[in-house]
Each structure stands twice: as C-alpha cells, then as structure tokens.
Amino acid sequence: MSVKGDIGVIGLAVMGQNLILNMNDHGFKVVAYNRTTSKVDEFLQGAAKGTNIIGAYSLEDLAAKLEKPRKVMLMVRAGDVVDQFIEALLPHLEEGDIIIDGGNSNYPDTNRRVKALAEKGIRFIGSGVSGGEEGARHGPSIMPGGNQEAWQYVKPIFQAISAKTEQGEPCCDWVGGEGAGHFVKMVHNGIEYGDMQLICEAYQFLKEGLGLSYEEMQAIFAEWKNTELDSYLIDITTDILGYKDASGEPLVEKILDTAGQKGTGKWTGINALDFGIPLTLITESVFARCVSSFKDQRVAANQLFGKTITPVEGDKKVWIEAVRKALLASKIISYAQGFMLIREASEQFGWDINYGATALLWREGCIIRSRFLGNIRDAYEANPNLVFLGSDSYFKGILENALSDWRKVVAKSIEVGIPMPCMASAITFLDGYTSARLPANLLQAQRDYFGAHTYERTDKPRGEFFHTNWTGRGGNTASTTYDV
C-alpha cells in the first residue's frame, strides 16, 4: 500500500511551493496540487525534484492520498477563490477532516467559514502566515485560529516549520476561535505599515532636514541596529541606503516616490473605526501612501505653493539622537494601538487571545520582527490585563525619556515643512490619552444643541443624561434617531 501524505497543499505559487519544501525538510509527507495541473509536474521536476513530495492531479486524487483526518491547506488568493475551492473539496472530504486557509483572508470571511463548515462536520482553520517567500521557505510566523479541535492535528506541522526564537520557541501558537488568526495577521500588517512609514519619516528628516548623505544615513541606521530599534525593517533599510546602482549612485534616490498597497492596512483602519479604537498612527500610514500616489498633483501643488524645506539648524548629533528617540517612542505607540485593537476584538468575539503569546509569534520570521517584541511579551506576561502598553514600566520609561526630544522633532518638522504624519499622530495620541480632561465637553454640548443628543454632567453620577433647550425654541426632547 502506498504511503499517504501528512498534509495536502493547494496552490503552487511561490508561497505555496516554499511552504511545501519547508514541510518536506522537516520530515512531513506533503501532497501538492494546483488547479493548473501542469504546474504540479513542473514543481515535482524542478524545485521538488529528489524530495518525498507527492503530486496530485485532481481534488479527488488529493483527498485519496492523505492520511485521515485529512489536512488540506489552501495557499490561494483571498476572497471568492477560497470559497470555490472549499465547495469543490467538500465532496471528497469526510466528517472530522480539516481545511486550512493560509492566505490573507479578511477575518469576517473566516468567521463565516468556520461556522458554515462546522455544520458540515469539517474543521476549519484560518491561519495568517507572515514572512514572505523567504519566511515560507525557512521559517514563517504562523497565526492559526478557528476550530480549536483541529489544532492538535496541525500543531506538530506548523510549529516544526515556523520560525524559532533564540530560545528555540516556535513563532506559532493557537491564537483563538473563528477569525482570530486572520485578525491578528491583519493587525500585524497594519503595524508593518506604521513601522515602514515611521522609518521613512526619520529618513526624510535626516536627509532633507539635516542634509545628511546616504553614507551618513546608512551608518546611522547601522548604529540603530544596536539599540532598542533593532529590527528586520531597520536592517533592510540599512542595506537599501547603502545600495548603489550601476552608475555608483544610491538606487533608492532614483525610485519613484509613490508607494503601493494591497489593502490590509486599510482593513486594519476600517476595523479600528468599527471597534471605536483610535488607531491613529496606522491609519495615518495608510493615508501617507495615498498621498504618495498623487505624484502629479503633488508636483503641481509644489510649484503652486513654492514649497521648500528649511534646513534644520543645530548640532546634528543631538538631532540624530532626538530622531532615534522619536522613532522609538512612536513605534511603541503604534504597537500599543495595535494591541488595543486586538484586545477589543478578542473581548467582543470571546476569542480569549493571549497578548504575550501574540507578541512571541512576531518575534521572528515576519516583517515586523524586532528586539522589543520580547519586551512586549514580558509586559503582557507580567500583566495579562494590561490595557495600554505604554503603562508598562519598561515602555513608560522609554516614553518619558523620549518625550522632550520627540516633541522637538515633531515641532521642528512642522516648522521647516517636513511631513511627519505618523510621528505627529503618535505624540498627539499620547497627549490625548494622558489628558484627564479633553474638550469633548464642548463637542457634546454642540451635539446636544443641534441634535438633542444629551450629555452627562461632571457633578452627577455617570449614566445620568441631560438635555438643555439651548435656544428656548427646541423643546426638551432628547434625540434617539439622529446621530453625528
């Protein structure tokens, strides 16, 4: 009798192929399938040649070649394609079999699929996979959620192929029910947007404000790798700043300043609005990409307004250290806001997400991997009920130490004309979050004035609502239908 596969993978684009090869390297027998079956032969005769990888040429063939309970992982484009493959797979599966979606699916789709497939006796996992092509091949960060009964069967495979911390801990663990895994991956992507934009803002201040050369900036970022800023994105930025093209000039200087996006940052911002979480920095990072896409309009506006950037005066070494502190403090706010969003979703959906374990998932293997994720894990292990990351003693100390320089950098950027939407939004958030009293009292009075939305009073218990007839003409009826 032929040996059967431990897991099947559908989708032989680069991510799918690399995950399969990774699984094979760790001793798992993988059955590979692609809708265009010629790609199966190409894979088996190419990258998979000489391995124990098994080819399948139909979904029926795939199911027949798998050990029970069958485990089938979809590495296909998010959206309708996932549903199409699920429907096509169902006739070939049995009760208790497992389907895993390893794509960048939107978590409401995963919520729906978990429930719908459970009614058919199929266990569904929605798993975020981060790290790109290299991570898939050598160790990604994996964020599984969904039907927890399936986890025991998938866990040995996923934890074996995932990235590992220096202590050997797998950057993969169960996140929570329904779409928790894909939700956490979505927030990961949003934080990635924020991290990248923050680095770009620091780069622009150093380059255009301080007038530093690429050689000088590369040396600065290389030095920052030895601080709390140590991360994959700082690492690759160091490489990028030092990369010369064939003419010997910095290549990045010749790259058009328009940034693309695939939409996951936007998803994070939309969900923050839906959940009522002030995800200001990540949302600004999405808008920064939007502004960058208006290249022709920006050039025209630059000419119309005669926009110039005034050089920053003063000791450059002092300013460089101030920028480092501002970058680090802003990054803390970005992660703090991201975890606030994860917490809110976990509480609303009953996912019971472990926030310290989530930080560990990102410690290696993914784009936002960084040194201080270990400190985030420590903070949540010390206090699982930590609401705001900046309240932890370690991060509070950094924020307090950075605050003066952070303000100087943001204020100076406004003064000289350097856009810093994320650093500015980060410090503005902290100022708002640490304010015992905000001007929302006036805002609520305005709402009551034009819409009779009522208000609470500082001299009365919370939960008691009042309405004022501000003009003498509006009566005393509170609004229950009109809201702003």
Swiss-Prot record:
EC top class, as a word: oxidoreductase
Residue numbers binding substrate: N104, S130, G131, G132, H188, N189, Y193, K262, R289, R447, H453
GO cellular-component term (any): cytosol
Binding-site residues for NADP(+), renumbered to this chain: G11, L12, A13, V14, M15, G16, N34, R35, T36, V76, R77, A78, N104
Catalytic activity: 6-phospho-D-gluconate + NADP(+) = D-ribulose 5-phosphate + CO2 + NADPH
Catalytic residues (UniProt): K185, E192
Complex formation: Homodimer.
Job of this protein: Catalyzes the oxidative decarboxylation of 6-phosphogluconate to ribulose 5-phosphate and CO(2), with concomitant reduction of NADP to NADPH.
Protein name as catalogued: 6-phosphogluconate dehydrogenase, decarboxylating
